[in-house]
């Protein structure tokens, strides 16, 4: 796996799924391919994106700044600085300085990542802030190691929280989660269907599923009534894709 592929993988792992994630993935690909070369326009776009947490925006802003060539005196962005200040905690700043000194001795991406993984997310963010504010310099490779370590920690905590939701025994939460997943799957089917003749069938299945979820929410139904809803939808989607000659078996 190339360095930039690895960075893209880690950064996207902390972005919530949805159309915005696809948009960010495209921007990252363009930036890494040297296509998107106006840093100011890119940062303005990032600043106004909804849904993303300030820290995620800060990390993305840091990655864009590392990758897109810019004029020497280009102003640093406040929204990135605020996100990478370790919540203003002096302990985070102290640890960030210690980490920075260790990173100065590293020359490889993996070496930097290993060193960084033993620090808290707050200290890692503060260390990124030091580098972003030009208070310290490291090689791009080392900076990317720091980024990936931070993303790994965030993704770990997101995974724990997601696992808690998936394994919850509360039937109401499970019921709602199944309906949300069915609804988003239906939306994806509608987007993928396009305008071919066979698309009408997929659109019909998706539309019925969304109507069913809407009705279930409106009248209130037994928590077990949503069981299998998303799986049925996915089977329909896969059958449709097979007829279209597309193989995407890994949706479930």
From Swiss-Prot:
Region span, RNP-binding: 165-252
Keyword rRNA-binding: no
Main localisation: virion
InterPro entries noted in UniProt: Flu_matrix_M1 (IPR036039), Flu_matrix_M1_C (IPR013188), Flu_matrix_M1_N (IPR001561), Flu_matrix_M1_N_sub1 (IPR015423), Flu_matrix_M1_N_sub2 (IPR015799), INFV_M1 (IPR037533)
Membrane topology: Peripheral membrane protein
Residues spanning the membrane: none
Gene3D superfamilies with a match to the protein in the record: 1.10.10.180, 1.20.91.10
Annotated keywords: Host nucleus, Membrane, RNA-binding, Viral matrix protein, Virion
Miscellaneous remark of the record: Most abundant protein in virion. When expressed alone can form virus-like particles in transfected cells.
Family as reported in the entry's similarity comment: Belongs to the influenza viruses Matrix protein M1 family.
Name of the protein this chain belongs to: Matrix protein 1
């Amino acid at each position: 796996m190339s360095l930039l592929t690895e960075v893209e993988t880690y950064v996207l792992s902390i972005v919530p799924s949805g159309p915005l994630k696809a948009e960010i993935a495209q921007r990252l690909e363009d930036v890494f391919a040297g296509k998107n070369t106006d840093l100011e326009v890119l940062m303005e776009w990032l600043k106004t994106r909804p849904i993303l947490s300030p820290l995620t925006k800060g990390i993305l802003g840091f990655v864009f700044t590392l990758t897109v060539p810019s004029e020497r005196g280009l102003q640093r962005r406040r929204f990135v600085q605020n996100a990478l200040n370790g919540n203003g905690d002096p302990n985070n700043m102290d640890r960030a300085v210690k980490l920075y000194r260790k990173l100065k001795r590293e020359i490889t991406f993996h070496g930097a990542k290993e060193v960084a993984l033993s620090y808290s997310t707050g200290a890692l963010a503060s260390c990124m802030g030091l580098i972003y504010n030009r208070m310290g310099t490291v090689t791009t490779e080392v900076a990317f190691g720091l980024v990936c370590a931070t993303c790994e920690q965030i993704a770990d905590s997101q995974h724990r929280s997601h696992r808690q939701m998936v394994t919850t025994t509360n039937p109401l939460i499970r019921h709602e989660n199944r309906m949300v997943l069915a609804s988003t799957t239906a939306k994806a089917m509608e987007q993928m269907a396009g305008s071919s003749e066979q698309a009408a069938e997929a659109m019909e299945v998706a539309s019925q599923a969304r109507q069913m979820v809407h009705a279930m929410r409106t009248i209130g139904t037994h928590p077990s009534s949503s069981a299998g809803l998303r799986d049925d939808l996915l089977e329909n989607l896969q059958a449709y894709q097979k007829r279209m000659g597309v193989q995407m078996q890994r949706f479930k």
